[in-house]
Curated annotation (Swiss-Prot):
This is Probable inorganic phosphate transporter 1-10. Expressed at low levels in roots. The gene is PHT1-10. High-affinity transporter for external inorganic phosphate. GO terms for molecular function: symporter activity. It is found in: Membrane. Residues 1-22, 90-96, 145-158, 225-295, 364-369, 419-439, 495-552 are cytoplasmic. It comes from Oryza sativa subsp. japonica. It is a multi-pass membrane protein. Residues 507-540 are annotated as: Disordered. Although related to the sugar transporter family, it does not transport sugars. The chain crosses the membrane at residues 23-43, 69-89, 97-117, 124-144, 159-179, 204-224, 296-316, 343-363, 370-390, 398-418, 440-460, 474-494. Residues 44-68, 118-123, 180-203, 317-342, 391-397, 461-473 are extracellular. SUPFAM superfamilies: MFS general substrate transporter. GO terms for cellular component: membrane.
Amino acid sequence: MAPIGVLTALDQARTQYYHFKAIVIAGMGLFTDSYDLFCIAPVMKIVGRVYYSDGGARPGVTPPAVVSATVGVALLGAVIGNVVFGALGDRVGRRRVYGACLLLMVCSSVGSGFSVCRTRRCALASLCFFRFLLGVGVGGDYPLSATIMSEFANRRTRGAFIAAVFSMQGFGILASSAVTMAVAAAFDHYTGYPAPLDTPECADLAWRIILMAGAVPAALTYYWRMSMPETARYTALVERDVVKATNDIGRVLADLDLGAVAEEEVAAALSRPPPPPRPSYGLLSRRFVRQHGRDLFACAAAWFLLDIPYYSSTLFQSQIYRPLFPAPGLINAFQEAFNVAKFQAVIAVASTIPGYFVAVLLIDRVGRRCLQMAGFLLMAVFLFALAGPYDGYWRDHGAHAGYIVLYSLTFFSANLGPNTTTFILPAELFPARFRSTCHGLSGAAGKLGALVGSIGFLWASQQKDGAAAGHLPGIGMMYALFVLGGICLLGLALTYVFTPETMMRSLEENESDRAQTQVGDGGSDTEAAKSPASMASSHLSMSPILPARVSV
């Protein structure tokens, strides 16, 4: 199957400035996602001191049910956002929906800081509401960021570009820690370093500033997001306007003779035999399941299995930093939040960000499938190493360097492998008219796994006898870690059996291979787009093909 000329030009384009600009623009949603995820832990320390200092079993400590609610509503919103905005990205267009997601994230981040009511219950309910909306926006950004980057990238470095977009999560963690530490230190100094059990009224302002700060980088990129053209693959394959696609690419990519590309494509379209009709099968139809069901299952199941141990490990941090810092009863609210953020920054610098960088370096050399299997295997090994001697040694030696190293290596392995590859693969395996939707479905499955991991781990890690206040008895930390390691091995087996390799293959080749296994009901989207009708501008108006370059 001969490819469309403009898509061939995209696959062969050299790496240039616009690619790196697109990485930053597309990565801001992931930046906001990790900022929101990691700032909530220190924020809830301050919230506990502000709203739960008047008695109770543990004064100054946010109840587990409230912590679970603030985490859970954002993840639930992300499930909905993945599905809804993923589908809209295929139906309305990537660019327009992209801007809507960003506005929702900005408004809900600001709204989280304005969760002001007269009662504690009302204030926290308002916070959960805005965090739900934030989750919807962040969830919608997942499929759109990955799809846009995959459709702009060239074949040779596509994996590295998408992985670089995803690596913005690491910088979001650092930003979250830096902002939290700066705000906490400033308020601590301004209030004269209050006593441990003395929480100034201005602490109610501190946590709001931390939450609202997440809106700033997202808001700064709104103009550039709306200046981006629609992706050429969406315009050519879904809207079936190859000339407009060529025109759009001419605005942003340099050193491509797009006029010649368009002339050749028009001539070829007029001389070639009529293409097969555009495929008419719908999402989750029988033909879709035959052609793409296996890939959708592989992507969704792997993401679901990954996020259970990944988000559980995030909550597991409290078991590690607790022995390293003074007890909460010996420090004030600002100092406690500062210590939590400081530990998160150390883990990010030592394991999370290096894992992303190694993934960017290896993804187009080793391949997605191998990295995903290696990551799952290493995660299982390190979780088992934490679990085996936990009751006999680690529980009483949590500050031991070996304990922290094993925990850090778990995050490194996740980001080196499945945490990155599960974001990349759904953006490469499906036809253009289903790409954003299928990525959204896969991402929604991942966030469901995150819900299971976040809420389930809080219960499972409790001891059968003597569970922490507010928790039901669980199976204990040691057995919970063994379960997480077993889930990683299941992810390894699933990847080996079901996940295909997409390295060094164009997006159209992935679609074509699956379309060739079917007969009837039309051909692939790429073949259908090669009709003279899609060249509606024809030879009479080729001047728009070479517009003046614009900066976007």
